[in-house]
Amino acid sequence: MAIDIHVYDTYVKAKDSHTMHFDVITDVQDHDKAIEFAKQWLATIGEDGAKVTGEECQFCHTQGAPEPVENEIKEKGFFIQKMEGCP
C-alpha cells in the first residue's frame, strides 16, 4: 500500500539568477523539514546558500506515493521532482 506524501512547491533563484522550480516531496507534513531537504538537495547541485524560506517553498498537496518515490523517501527522507530550470 502506498504511503501518503506531501508535496512542497518550490521556486529558488540560482547563482546565475535563473529560477529553478522543483517539488520537495516527503512523508511528513513538516514545512521546516521540507525547507531543510530543499537546502540539502541544492547543496548537491552546487547551489548551497540559495535562499529557501516559507516564501520559496510552500505546501501544495498530499497524495499517494508512486513506488519509486516511496522507495527514495524511505532511503533519503525526501524526493525531489525537478520541474523547470533544474540541472
Regions found by a protein language model. Name each.
Residues F37-P87:
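Acidic, low-complexity intrinsically disordered segments
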